Every structure is written in structure tokens, then in C-alpha cells.
Regions:
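Mid-to-C-terminal alpha-helical segments outside catalytic/metal-binding sites
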Residues: 178-179, 186-187, 194-201, 218-239
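Metal-coordinating catalytic core of metallo-dependent amide/deamination hydrolases
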Residues: 1-76
Length: 239
């Protein structure tokens, strides 16, 4: 994510910073194979709609797939831009407009929602229920970071999604698995149990996924299988 914020040395020269990324960083990153996606934080007092459009269009021309962080703080038009550019996904979206939600649904943009971030910042939760009802594919991520999301708890994420975003447990599981794989263009390889896909499984200590939202702050994982190999058994990492 080359354009999360303007570095101090570029402050007040945001357009020049965008140019620097397009002219210098994109070719270098592409040549070294360091990234598959290009991302930008389209938000008030960060990067404008036009700056974001220019950055993302240039990224696509240089072979990158597109992502965008949008409409977290204010309703800014980032969701609409995500739809316009057919981004793979748009993150945050706490303040996404009705028009933005429709634009994402029409363009097949995955709405990646971050309920633990909203919880940590005491912000309004994204409208997950309305997004699903509008035809959006909703995904979830923890957004674990020291500045705005202080938890990696999946049970807490599920509880927030079901209580405050009004998703069913089935919808929350779908969002956290196959839809999250779609957000990184990996749905053909991971995210569900299917013939030919990578063998990634989590077995819980309880008889149903429906227990996930009811055990906030608890580790309910019994077994983790990664690429067909058992890496956690009885809640303990295998050496």
C-alpha cells in the first residue's frame, strides 16, 4: 500500500507524491515482483478522489490489481470510485453511501469490513446487512495494527458482525472464508473445502460454527490443518 498517507517530507505535495509512486515505485515493485495489488487510502485529508483515481488507473496500466481503503471517516465517494474502477475490494466503508454500495454491488467489488477497527475506535459499524441485501459480497478481516485495531480475536469479530452488523452466523462464516479469499483473488484456491483446493481447515471444540459469536475472548480452536498438514492439535501448536 504505497499511498496510505503522505510522508512528512512530502507534506503539502500530495500530487507530487502520487507522481513519485507512479513514476518510481510502481516500476520498481513490478520489476521485483514485490506486490500483486496496489492500494490507496481515499479519505478526507488523506488522498482525494482524483488523486486516488489517477494512482489506481496508473497502477492498473502497470499490471497491478486494484484495492482501495475508502469512506472510513466521512462519506467521501470512495465506494463509488471502487465500483467505477472495478477494484477487487474496498476496505473499511463505515460511511459508504447507498449509491456507493450499489456501485460496488454492480461492479462485483468485495466489501472488506473491519469490525474490530470500528470497535477499537468506538466508531459506527459498517452497514454489512444493507450491503449484503444490496448484492455486495462482504468479507471480513481483523485489521490488526497498533494504531486502530487492537485485537486478532476471531470470536470477537464474529460477535460484532452478528450483533452490530446484523449478519447471521452463516453469513459471517462466508464473509470470513470464501469471500475473504475472493478479496485477494484466491477464491479458486482457498476459502472453502472443495476438490482441488488447498487443504486449509479449522476444527472447533464445539459441534457447530454457530458457537463462534457466543465465545468472545475464548480460543475455541481444537485443530488447524494447513496445506493438508496438522499444525495445531488439541489447541497446541505442533513442533
Amino acid at each position: 500500500m504505497g499511498a496510505h498517507a503522505t510522508p512528512a517530507e512530502w507534506k503539502g505535495r500530495e500530487d507530487e507524491f502520487i507522481d513519485f509512486n507512479i513514476r518510481e515505485m510502481f516500476p520498481l515493485v513490478a520489476k521485483e515482483g514485490l506486490a500483486e495489488f496496489a492500494d490507496i487510502f481515499c479519505e478526507k485529508d488523506v488522498f482525494t478522489i482524483e488523486q486516488s483515481r489517477r494512482y489506481l488507473q496508473a497502477a492498473r496500466e502497470q499490471g497491478f490489481k486494484l484495492k482501495i481503503h475508502a469512506d472510513e471517516i466521512v462519506q467521501f465517494g470512495g465506494a463509488e470510485l471502487a465500483g467505477e474502477l472495478h477494484c477487487a475490494s474496498a476496505d473499511h466503508l463505515l460511511q459508504a453511501s447507498d449509491a456507493g454500495i450499489r456501485a460496488m454491488a454492480d461492479a462485483g467489488v468485495v466489501a472488506t469490513l473491519l469490525p474490530l477497527t470500528a470497535f477499537s475506535l468506538r466508531e459506527t459499524f459498517a452497514r454489512g446487512r444493507e450491503m449484503i441485501d444490496a448484492g455486495c459480497m462482504v468479507a471480513f478481516a481483523t485489521d490488526l495494527n497498533p494504531g486502530s485495531s487492537f485485537s486478532a480475536s476471531v470470536p470477537l469479530l464474529f460477535a460484532l458482525a452478528c450483533i452490530y452488523m446484523k449478519l447471521s452466523p452463516e453469513e459471517a462464516v462466508t464473509a470470513f472464508t470464501i469471500n475473504s479469499a475472493a478479496a485477494i483473488d484466491r477464491a479458486d484456491r482457498i476459502g472453502s473445502i472443495d476438490v482441488g483446493k488447498q487443504g486449509d481447515l479449522v476444527l472447533l471444540q464445539f459441534p457447530s460454527y454457530k458457537f463462534l459469536p457466543y465465545h468472545v475472548g475464548m480460543n475455541i480452536v481444537d485443530t488447524v490443518i494447513k496445506q493438508g498438514e496438522v499444525v495445531v492439535k488439541n489447541g497446541e501448536t505442533k513442533s
